[in-house]
Amino acid sequence: MSSYFVNPLFSKYKGGETLEPTYYDCRFPQSVARSHTLVYGHGAAAPGFQHPSHHVQDFFHHGTTGISNPGYQQNPCALACHGDATKFYGYEALPRQPLYGTQQEATLAQYPDCKSSNSTNPGEGQGHLSQNSSPSLMFPWMRPHAPGRRNGRQTYSRYQTLELEKEFLFNPYLTRKRRIEVSHALSLTERQVKIWFQNRRMKWKKENNKDKFPGQRGEAEAEAEEEGNEDGEAEEGEDKETEEKEESKE
């Protein structure tokens, strides 16, 4: 099993080269040596540390499954000797690039308008936003005095209401000529006068439950009086005839 993985490795290295990683060829720095003297003293011997290079070679040559030497111990200064973890097995770390910058440049490349707006000053950007927020198109119904937009309810003054009531009592139906005269006299439009009279007629019908309006009341009374007079005259004539018949019989 081990030979299957070892053979490709030997084809890459020459006979004089070794498979020893580069990070083992380091020396103790002065700070580590100084700490060693403080911990163990000048005359004390440091714990046993054995270079693991021959174990690596034995592993590839003999196919051993692991390091079987019981005397091997991990020294506390091993991390300082080995150096940075990014240089493990001789590989150096690649230079890091800011991810946010690359993503931002990619998005700005797709949308050049955003890039041009970001390059401007903040004050100019705020002005640009305020200009964009305002509507660019003005439709007719958005204007204050648009023809298709409904106006508020018309309020009539006391003088206008009084004059309209007088005109309604005189004649509930106005001709076109009289409507124009009333509208000019009261500073109203012809349509406003027409609507007021329509509403007033409906109100009067609901209050009185009658079909005849106040302007037609005099005519109706006159007709009723005439009918009553005719009936009275007819009754008087009949009474006279009956009296004459009775006298003749006697």
From Swiss-Prot:
DNA-binding region: 149-208
GO-annotated cellular components: nucleus
Protein's job: Sequence-specific transcription factor which is part of a developmental regulatory system that provides cells with specific positional identities on the anterior-posterior axis.
Locations listed in the record: Nucleus
Motif annotated as Antp-type hexapeptide, chain positions: 138-143
Location of the region described as Disordered in the Swiss-Prot/TrEMBL record: 112-152, 206-250
Matching Gene3D superfamilies: Homeodomain-like
Biased composition (Polar residues): 115-136
Entries under InterPro entries matching the protein: Antp_homeobox_TF, HD, HD_metazoa, Homeobox_Antennapedia_CS, Homeobox_CS, Homeodomain-like_sf
BP terms from Gene Ontology: embryonic pectoral fin morphogenesis; endocrine pancreas development; exocrine pancreas development; regulation of transcription by RNA polymerase II; swimming
GO molecular function, one term: DNA-binding transcription factor activity, RNA polymerase II-specific
Primary location class: nucleus
Lineage start: Eukaryota, Metazoa, Chordata, Craniata, Vertebrata
Keywords of this entry: Developmental protein, DNA-binding, Homeobox, Nucleus, Transcription, Transcription regulation
Protein known as: Homeobox protein Hox-C8a
